[in-house]
Regions:
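N-terminal basic/disordered segments at the start of proteins
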Residues: 1-35
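Cap/lid and interdomain-hinge subdomains that line or gate substrate/regulatory clefts
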Residues: 2, 6-9, 107-232, 236-239
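Short beta-strand elements in bilobed, periplasmic/extracellular small-molecule ligand-binding domains
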Residues: 31-55, 142-148, 205-211
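Short, well-structured alpha-helical segments in soluble
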Residues: 59-71, 88-90, 257-266
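C-terminal catalytic subdomain
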Residues: 296-416
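Extended hydrophobic packing segments that form well-structured cores
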Residues: 370-473
C-alpha cells in the first residue's frame, strides 16, 4: 500500500466480580485465558487492551481507552457469567459493533469430576451471551456472536475473529485516508453524482478536489532517472505491451507514475475518482493518453482509481482491495443468452492482482469510446473460479446501500479489444441476475474480486451501519 492504515480493535474480557473472592483460583485462570485470547487477534490490527473487567469502574476505564483510541471494532471475551453492567459502560459511547466471543475452554465437561470453580472457569463462557445481546439491542448497539472452544483448537472461531478484523480495516482506511476527485463525473451519469458532505458524514471519507491543470504539471519536477527507470521496469513487469515494450517506450508513463505515487503519499489518498472531458494537447494530451495504465499502477499498490468520476465505485474497489487484495472496476457488459452467462467488465484502469489467468496487456487505441482522446487501454484476465461483485448506491435520503453477488467465472471466449471482461455464471441464471441486480438500484459500476467475500462484506456493512442487498450467492 502506498498509504498504510491499521485498524484499531478494542479488546476486553468480563467476569462476575462476586466469583473471585469465593473462588480465588479463578483469578490466575482468567488471566491466562485472556492472555491466550489476545494472541488470537491478528497482528494486522492494533489491539487496544481494555483488560479484564469485573466492575462498572473497570468497564468505564476500558470505555475511556476505546473512545480515546477511536476504535473501529470491539471484541469482548466472555470468560464466565457476568452481568451486563460489566459490558455496557465500556461500549455505550461507541458507534461500532461489539463482537461477543464465547470460547469455552474445555470441549466437554467431565461431569463426575467437575466442581463449581472448574465449571465457572472452564465451562460457563456461554452463560451471559443472551443477556449481553439483549442489552446491546436496547442500547441501540450493533453486535455479533462467535461461539467456539479452546481445547483442540477452533479454526472456525479463529477465522471469524480474523474476518471481523479484516472488515475493521475498511473503516480505518476510510477514516485515515482521503479521496481525490479530479475533474467531475461523466456528464449525465446522474447515478454517480454524490454529496461530498453527506459522504463524509455517513462513511467518514473526506473528498479533496483537484483540477486537471495541476495534474498535467505533476511530473514537471520529477528528475530522478533511477526512480523513473525502476518504475518503467515495474510497468514492463506488470504489462505485456502490444508491439513490444521497452524502457524508453514507457519512460514518460513511468515519470508520471513516480509523480502520482508521491502525490498519493503527500495527500494521504486511498481513493481517486477522475474524468476528463476536454481536448488536451501537448503535455496534457500525453498524460491523458497514458492515464489508464498509470492509475492501474496505483491500484496495484492499494489506491482505488475509478474512471468517469465515480466516487461510489472507488469506495467499492477499495473495500474489496482491503478485504481480498484485489478490486477491479466492472459493469454489466453483455449477456450470452445461449450460454446463460453474464459478461461483466469495463474499460479503463484495473487491478493487476486480479489478473491470475494471464499477464495484463496494454494496447493503444485511437479513441476512448464515449470520451475524448485516445491512448493506452489495459486489459486484465481474472482466473476461472468464484467471484464477488460489490456495488454501492444511495436511497432518496442519501443513505448508502451495498449491493452484492457471488458467481463463478468460467473459461471461454472474451472480447479482445482492450477492455477487461469476465464470463460469470450465477446460480439464478443470467436473465434473473440482470433483473435482480438492476432492481436493487446500484450505480451502473461495480467492483469485482476473485473469491467469495459476501460474508466479509456483511461485516463491513455492519461496521458502517449500511444495509445490504444480497442478490445471489
Amino acid at each position: 500500500m502506498l498509504v498504510n492504515t491499521k485498524a484499531r480493535v478494542g479488546v476486553f474480557a468480563i467476569a462476575l466480580g462476586a466469583y473471585l473472592p469465593q473462588f480465588p483460583s479463578l483469578v490466575p485462570e482468567f488471566e491466562a485465558q485472556y492472555a491466550d485470547f489476545k494472541k488470537r487477534i491478528p497482528d494486522s490490527v492494533e489491539l487496544i487492551d481494555g483488560g479484564i473487567v469485573t466492575t462498572k469502574e473497570l468497564a468505564c476505564a476500558a470505555g475511556d481507552k476505546f473512545r480515546a483510541a477511536d476504535v473501529d471494532l470491539v471484541i469482548l471475551q466472555l470468560l464466565t457469567y457476568a452481568t451486563s453492567y460489566n459490558m455496557l459502560p465500556a461500549v455505550c459511547d461507541l458507534d461500532v459493533p461489539v463482537v461477543l466471543v464465547n470460547l469455552q475452554k474445555k470441549a466437554a465437561p467431565d461431569y463426575a469430576n467437575t466442581d463449581t470453580a472448574t465449571w465457572l472457569g472452564e465451562l460457563y463462557a456461554c452463560g451471559a451471551v443472551g443477556e449481553m445481546v439483549a442489552d446491546l439491542e436496547r442500547a441501540g448497539k450493533r453486535h455479533a456472536v462467535i461461539t467456539g472452544v479452546v481445547e483442540g483448537g477452533d479454526p472456525e472461531a479463529d477465522a471469524e475473529i480474523a474476518d471481523w478484523c479484516r472488515a475493521a480495516q475498511v473503516r480505518r482506511r476510510f477514516r485515515d485516508t482521503n479521496l481525490a476527485q479530479i475533474g467531475r463525473p461523466y456528464p449525465g451519469m446522474m447515478d454517480l453524482y454524490i454529496d461530498e458532505t453527506n459522504l463524509y458524514h455517513r462513511m467518514f471519507l473526506y473528498t479533496k478536489q483537484f483540477d486537471w491543470e495541476k495534474m498535467w504539471a505533476i511530473a514537471d519536477d520529477v528528475t530522478d532517472e533511477d526512480a523513473i527507470r525502476a518504475k518503467a521496469q515495474d510497468i514492463l513487469d506488470t504489462f505485456d505491451i502490444e508491439g513490444g515494450g521497452t524502457i524508453e517506450k514507457v519512460w514518460d508513463m513511468a515519470k508520471y507514475v513516480v509523480a502520482f505515487e508521491q502525490w498519493v503519499k503527500d495527500e494521504q489518498l486511498g481513493f481517486v475518482a477522475s474524468h476528463y472531458d476536454g481536448f488536451a494537447q501537448g503535455v496534457a494530451g500525453k498524460l491523458d493518453s497514458m492515464l489508464i495504465p498509470a492509475f492501474s499502477m496505483l491500484i496495484k499498490q492499494g489506491t482505488a482509481c475509478a474512471v468517469e468520476g465515480d466516487i461510489k465505485v472507488a469506495m467499492a474497489m477499495s473495500i474489496l482491495k482491503t478485504i481480498s487484495g484485489m478490486g477491479q472496476l466492472s459493469e454489466m457488459y453483455s449477456i450470452d443468452f445461449p450460454e446463460d452467462i453474464c459478461i461483466i467488465g469495463h474499460s479503463g484502469s484495473g487491478d493487476a492482482d486480479i489478473s491470475k489467468a494471464k499477464k495484463p496487456t496494454m494496447k493503444i487505441v485511437p479513441v476512448f469510446h464515449g470520451k475524448t482522446g485516445g491512448g493506452y487501454l489495459t486489459q486484465f484476465y481474472p482466473a476461472p473460479g468464484p467471484v464477488t461483485y460489490l456495488g454501492i448506491t444511495q436511497d432518496r435520503d442519501g443513505h448508502f446501500k451495498f449491493v452484492v453477488a457471488e458467481g463463478v467465472n468460467e473459461p471461454g471466449p472474451i472480447f479482445t479489444f482492450g477492455d477487461t471482461n469476465m464470463r460469470t455464471r450465477f446460480t439464478c441464471g443470467a436473465r434473473d441476475f440482470c433483473n435482480r441486480w438492476s432492481e436493487a438500484g446500484p450505480t451502473h459500476h461495480m467492483a469485482a474480486a476473485s473469491g467469495r467475500w459476501i460474508d466479509t462484506i456483511l461485516k463491513v456493512a455492519k461496521i458502517f451501519n449500511v444495509p445490504v442487498d444480497v442478490i445471489t450467492r
